[in-house]
A protein has these predicted regions:
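Ser/Thr/Pro/Gly-rich low-complexity, intrinsically disordered segments
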Residues: 1-5
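Cysteine-centric segments in proteins
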Residues: 7-89
Length: 89
């Protein structure tokens, strides 16, 4: 998926997505998204999905790492709340 400059967090530490997110899979959608109420209040009502994929990120120490990311997405709202779940080799 093509991306502009996008940022996420590891706790309170920011990271930058570098390049595209690959191997995108839907984990949950609609009522299956546990924090749906929070997402609707914070970003707007729409059909929210939780997704995961593999991407390269730039960490605050400027190192590039390949990681598994999780995030939420809704049509017309976009991607929100990126989280690094696993560092890959």
């Amino acid at each position: 998926l093509p991306l502009g400059p996008q940022w996420g967090t590891i706790g309170l530490v920011k990271f930058e997505l570098v390049g595209d997110i690959e191997q995108v899979e839907t984990i949950a959608s609609g009522r299956g998204v546990k924090i749906r109420t929070h997402l609707q209040k914070a970003y707007g009502k729409d059909r929210w999905r939780k997704l995961k994929g593999v991407a390269t990120v730039r960490l605050p120490n400027r190192k590039l790492r390949k990681v598994e990311l999780h995030w939420y997405e809704a049509h017309g709202i976009g991607r929100r709340d990126f989280k690094i779940k696993t560092y890959l080799v």
